[in-house]
Amino acid sequence: MDPLKICENYLTFRSIIKGSTFSPGVFRRWRFHGLADVVGNIVEREEGRFWEIVPETHTLWAVFRGGFTVAPFTEILTSLQLENRGRQLAFLAFLSFLLRNWPSDSVVSEDARLDLVCAPAWSRIQIWSQAARLINDLPESVFEGQGSVVEEEQGEEHLARDSDDPFFD
């Protein structure tokens, strides 16, 4: 399963994120894409880690309460790395976590929250996917003579640590 491929269509992506915010059970499994159930299960399993990243006292929640989302999402999305399936699933789960825990007294209606989260995230995913396709389509001759042996060894070491587990330590 390639999460980025599945999320190419905005409405599908939006539906997956929305579905992942529902409690586990028959409704989530049958009403939404299978990826919504996977993402929802990750959120439930790793919720403690998400709370460590963004504790209840974090200013992000106050910003969301006030309806300001552009600056926080810009900061979150610019550092986004989606090299492998684990990171992709972790990112989708983090979006679901934010929506599940959005302050109920926020000036933003529940309907608008989904699009405030999904629109910039989907745009970033599309940019990431396009860049990855362009790099993969480059001829090998472009890369000849670039990089040193040390850089290649570091790259191999990074790949050795790469995992599909969304929270690989």
UniProtKB/Swiss-Prot annotation:
UniProt keyword list: Early protein, Host-virus interaction, Inhibition of host apoptosis by viral BCL2-like protein, Modulation of host cell apoptosis by virus
Pfam families, sorted: Adeno_E1B_19K
Biological process annotations from GO: symbiont-mediated suppression of host apoptosis
Region span, Disordered: 147-169
Biased composition annotated in UniProt, kind: Basic and acidic residues: 156-169
Family affiliation: Belongs to the adenoviridae E1B 19 kDa protein family.
Protein name: E1B protein, small T-antigen
Organism per entry: Canine adenovirus serotype 1 (strain Glaxo) (CAdV-1)
